[in-house]
Structure formats: structure tokens, C-alpha cells
Amino acid sequence: MLINTDEIKNIYVAKQFCDMRKQIDGLALIVTSQFSMNVLDHSLFIFTNASRNRIKMLYYEANGFWLFTRRLENGKFKFKKHEESGVLMITPPTAQLAD
């Protein structure tokens, strides 16, 4: 079963790099404590490592969390320039992750 992407309200990309050893609870703590956001509000949160070749995506749906991981063997993930806040918000229809 995959997530229903129609239910994703917003997509947030963390501005700071993240320790990729963090799992659901650690990433949820970043969302609530550092970003002051509700991790249960049907938003997708994206975290990347310092070399930008790995991402983790955290999403809460119905009664549980999804945690997705992607590792590029070649290349890096590219994101638009970040604003002053700790996260960059992008809307689902315009969301693009480039390899």
C-alpha cells in the first residue's frame, strides 16, 4: 500500500542537514521542536544529509507514520535556494526533486 499523495497538504524541505541515522521519532522531534510544526498535519517532511546524496521523507497518514529513504549512487539531490526560515515549503503540484 502506498500513500495517497492527494492528501499531502504541503511539502517541507529541512534547511539544515540531518543525521541519517535518525528514524521516525528523531525526525518527528525535529519537526516539532526545531520547526514548531505539527508532524500529524498531512505534510511531507524531507531531510537530507550533508553530501546531499541521501534523503529521508517523513509523513503521517491515518494511524501511522511512513518513512521513505532514497540514496543516490551518483549525483546529488538539488533543491531551490532556502529562505531564512528553517524549512522551505513547496506545494505538491510543483514539487520536484532532481537527481
Task: Go through each PLM region and give its residues.
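Polybasic/polar functional segments that serve as interface/processing modules
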Residues: 1-99
